[in-house]
Swiss-Prot record:
Superkingdom of this protein's organism: Eukaryota
InterPro entries given in the database record: 4_helix_cytokine-like_core, PRF/CT
Protein name, entry field: Cardiotrophin-1
Keywords: Cytokine, Secreted
Organism name: Mus musculus
UniProt keyword Glycoprotein present: no
Compartment(s) of residence: Secreted
Taxonomic lineage: Eukaryota, Metazoa, Chordata, Craniata, Vertebrata
Length: 203
């Protein structure tokens, strides 16, 4: 990733003729990563639900919405924003998700220690979404639309699960469910937003 970023900066200082094809390649690469993570996110949510026991997975069950500090799903107005602003919002959300996914993994290690596959999937998801966030920020910088400031402190976000642990096991499972769901929503939204920058992409 760092080598790719360095190459972008080198091409940008050389000339727009050599820079644009390289930027297009970076956008395609990042879009492909987002598309792959969208599929992984669907699998992660299914796997998470399978490991939580009833009532998770039962027909008609809809977990209550619990607040998550520093992160919510894409707003309805997101699609009407300029692409650069959408990508800024994507990058901000992606920067928060690794800490949340790590917190879910730690809680699941306590609740489901015999679910190593789920724990590995959560660990992989945190690492992969961190890579996607860095790639989106690289694209933004190359477009001259860098992300605006840092996201919430990871420690503050992670303590959400500690603070809610006193509310019981069910609440912890619901929080994990929503984190996995938000992970899927944001990587899917990122895929769609990047797709509008890919030549021949669909809006």
């Amino acid at each position: 990733m760092s080598q790719r970023e360095g190459s972008l900066e080198d091409h940008q200082t050389d000339s727009s003729i050599s820079f644009l094809p390289h930027l297009e390649a970076k956008i395609r690469q990042t879009h492909n990563l987002a598309r792959l993570l969208t599929k992984y996110a669907e699998q992660l949510l299914e796997e998470y639900v399978q490991q939580q026991g009833e009532p998770f997975g039962l027909p008609g069950f809809s977990p209550p919405r619990l607040p998550l500090a520093g992160l919510s799903g894409p707003a309805p107005s997101h699609a009407g924003l300029p692409v650069s602003e959408r990508l800024r919002q994507d990058a901000a959300a992606l920067s928060v998700l690794p800490a949340l996914l790590d917190a879910v993994r730690r809680r699941q290690a306590e609740l489901n220690p015999r679910a190593p596959r789920l724990l590995r999937s959560l660990e992989d998801a945190a690492r992969q979404v961190r890579a996607l966030g860095a790639a989106v920020e690289t694209v933004l910088a190359a477009l001259g639309a860098a992300a605006r400031g840092p996201g919430p402190e990871p420690v503050t976000v992670a303590t959400l699960f500690t603070a809610n642990s006193t509310a019981g096991i069910f609440s912890a499972k619901v929080l994990g469910f929503h984190v996995c769901g938000l992970y899927g929503e944001w990587v899917s939204r990122t895929e769609g937003d990047l797709g509008q920058l890919v030549p021949g992409g669909v809006a």
